Design a protein with these regions (language model features):
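Bacterial signal peptide processing site
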Residues: 19-22
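Core segments of small alpha/beta cavity-forming domains
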Residues: 31-147
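Positively charged n-region of N-terminal signal peptides that target proteins for export
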Residues: 1-9
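Exposed beta-sheet edge and beta->alpha loop/turn motif
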Residues: 149-229
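C-terminal motif of bacterial Sec signal peptides marking the signal peptidase cleavage site
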Residues: 14-17
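Intrinsically disordered, low-complexity serine/threonine-rich repeat tracts
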Residues: 25-31
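Polar low-complexity intrinsically disordered regions enriched in Ser/Thr and small residues
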Residues: 8, 73, 144, 151-154
Length: 229
């Protein structure tokens, strides 16, 4: 009877352990099973936030902790247990939970590079760090950053994202940016759309975007964007 009771308790324990929700993983730890479109869109959404830390804005800052170097003032990056965004899922199309990013803690330049390279190819990451070499800086091994950003594209009204599988190791993500400037340019206006096709490829280090654009990357020079006066 004792043996039966012990076996029953073990079975219940194992079942309880299997019933929990799986922990989210980073792109380079993503399962080798085929990605879904929603997985890829979630990867794009998280990668876009990371890309914008360099091109559009900056990481959260503690404005009470400042350092100066030359004419620049730096503030300590406050990015412990930072949650990266995912796209909104109205309704799951199957029983599998979509891929979601892990929370990240960024306290040094090395952490920042590691997080960026979780989503983007090393070449893209190198270019991002080169955009503004003085944007982020370690002081005594702790990450600081200058405050400010370039400001988002005023002409951007909205955008949509769609993913398509090319083969087992390659997806494309098509981002459609919509323009509308009537609210601040009337009676003139700029309307239309532009598209960017991004590549997500399975590399030796996991899934990485090998091409990318800013989250507000509307191309006002595109043939499908029109200006009326």
């Amino acid at each position: 009877m004792r043996r039966f009771g012990a076996l029953l308790l073990l079975t219940i324990t194992l079942l309880a352990g299997c019933g929990g929700r799986e922990s989210p993983v980073s792109p380079d730890e993503a399962p080798e099973t085929a990605l879904t479109e929603q997985d890829v869109i979630n990867m794009y959404t998280a990668a876009s936030a990371v890309y914008d830390w360099f091109d559009l804005t900056t990481l959260p800052l503690d404005m009470e902790d400042a350092r100066t170097e030359g004419d620049l003032t730096y503030y300590r990056v406050d990015a412990e247990n930072l949650s990266l965004p995912v796209s909104t899922v109205a309704e799951l199309t199957d029983s599998a939970l979509p891929w979601q990013p892990q929370r990240v803690t960024i306290t040094s330049l090395a952490d920042l590079r590691e997080t960026a390279e979780s989503y983007l190819s090393p070449e893209i990451v190198d270019n991002l760090f080169a955009l503004s070499p003085d944007h982020y800086k370690d002081f005594d091994g702790v990450l600081y950053a200058t405050d400010g950003g370039r400001g988002s594209n005023l002409y951007l009204l909205d955008k949509t994202v769609a993913a398509e599988q090319v083969d087992a190791d390659h997806w494309t993500v098509t981002v459609t940016f919509y323009a509308d400037s009537w609210a601040f340019e009337k009676p003139s206006t700029t309307v239309g759309y532009s598209q960017a096709v991004l590549d997500l490829e399975h590399t030796a280090d996991g899934w990485k975007f090998t091409s990318f654009v800013p989250s507000d990357g509307l191309d006002l020079e595109a043939e499908t964007v029109f200006q009326f006066t």
